[in-house]
Amino acid sequence: MSETIEEKLKNYKTAPFDARFPNQNQTRNCYQNYLDFYRCTKALTAKGVDPLPCDWYRRVYKSLCPMSWVQKWDEQQEEGIFAGNV
Amino acid sequence: MTKQMHAFHMVNPSPWPLTGAASAFMLTSGLAMWFHKHSNTLIFLSMILMLLTMYQWWRDITREGTFQGHHTSLVQKSLRYGMILFIVSEVCFFFGFFWTFYHSSLSPSPDLGMMWPPKGVIPLDPFEIPLLNTAILLGSGVSVTWAHHSLMEKTHKDMVISLSITIILGIYFTLLQGMEYFNSTFNISDNAYGSTFFVATGFHGGHVIIGTLFLTVCLLRQLMFHFTSSHHFGFEAAAWYWHFVDVVWLFLFISIYWWGS
């Protein structure tokens, strides 16, 4: 990839094809990017680095995931009952 | 006196298939009564009927074979096929539970956090009690083979000792598993981990108990000198069943206890 992350974010239209999730059911695509956003943010802020690259994952999950799921997971994270490993 | 000109066993009319079928019907409908109408009567009656059926039917088979001589080598051959086919059906039964386990654990769903074991589940250490249980069952496989050879070599006392050891090991396994169940931090209603774990190991434990009972019946029969050194199919059937139980445990140990942790 010859684009920088800033360029990729600027040119973002919608979630691109992800070969890890080739089929019609994109649930895991949504969930994986949701997890990756929070993991990325946690890791980069722990290192004291600007978490801008994590924004990619946020864009993708916001494009893919149903809002109700995101709200549910956000609430679970706040209550400490989120099942994923962040 | 008319003789039969074939080696097959034409069994006398018997009520036990009917009572067995009736008890199976009452068991299933009794289960529904228990679930939906909070009534234990039907299922309780069906269990009594089932136990009576088993006792009397197998007693009759012993009478026909050991005392009346109806079990020619041809009859014994068909009994062997029967036991083998039954064990094959049991393999199919457990195959389903292993399928379920691998379905849930190979690609865990987002509801489980896409991880296995799921967050919050502390799996049992496979190298503590489960490893001991593996050694116990493997050892009991050795002792039951010793019992078989003692039987074939006409050393009655050795056979009684080695079969008793096998039974004691079976009971020891059951007690240890019971302790593990009591002391585990998760139960059957804790997500897919709990379901797969307890259904698979639970049915296995039930089969250990059945196998132990079968071996105990063989011990009692040996003490009453039912078996000869060349004709002892009841014992062989029990030993096959016991080896099957051991093999299922090995698969459980490797898949659920070890890989699944």
Curated annotation (Swiss-Prot), chain B:
Keywords assigned: Membrane, Mitochondrion, Mitochondrion inner membrane, Translocase, Transmembrane, Transmembrane helix
GO molecular function: cytochrome-c oxidase activity
Enzyme class: translocase
Subcellular localization: Mitochondrion inner membrane
Sequence ranges on the Mitochondrial intermembrane membrane side: 35-40, 106-128, 184-190, 257-261
SUPFAM superfamilies, sorted: Cytochrome c oxidase subunit III-like
Biological process, per Gene Ontology: mitochondrial electron transport, cytochrome c to oxygen
Transmembrane portions of the chain: 16-34, 41-66, 73-105, 129-152, 156-183, 191-223, 233-256
Lineage top rank: taxon: Eukaryota
GO cellular component, one term: mitochondrial inner membrane
Reactions performed catalytically: 4 Fe(II)-[cytochrome c] + O2 + 8 H(+)(in) = 4 Fe(III)-[cytochrome c] + 2 H2O + 4 H(+)(out)
The enzyme's E.C. designation: 7.1.1.9
Membrane disposition: Multi-pass membrane protein
Ranges in the topological domain labelled Mitochondrial matrix: 1-15, 67-72, 153-155, 224-232
One Pfam entry name: COX3
CDD domains documented for this protein: Cyt_c_Oxidase_III
Family per similarity comment: Belongs to the cytochrome c oxidase subunit 3 family.
Assembly and binders: Component of the cytochrome c oxidase (complex IV, CIV), a multisubunit enzyme composed of 14 subunits. The complex is composed of a catalytic core of 3 subunits MT-CO1, MT-CO2 and MT-CO3, encoded in the mitochondrial DNA, and 11 supernumerary subunits COX4I, COX5A, COX5B, COX6A, COX6B, COX6C, COX7A, COX7B, COX7C, COX8 and NDUFA4, which are encoded in the nuclear genome.
Function as written in the Swiss-Prot or TrEMBL entry: Component of the cytochrome c oxidase, the last enzyme in the mitochondrial electron transport chain which drives oxidative phosphorylation. The respiratory chain contains 3 multisubunit complexes succinate dehydrogenase (complex II, CII), ubiquinol-cytochrome c oxidoreductase (cytochrome b-c1 complex, complex III, CIII) and cytochrome c oxidase (complex IV, CIV), that cooperate to transfer electrons derived from NADH and succinate to molecular oxygen, creating an electrochemical gradient over the inner membrane that drives transmembrane transport and the ATP synthase.
Protein known as: Cytochrome c oxidase subunit 3
Annotated source species: Myxine glutinosa
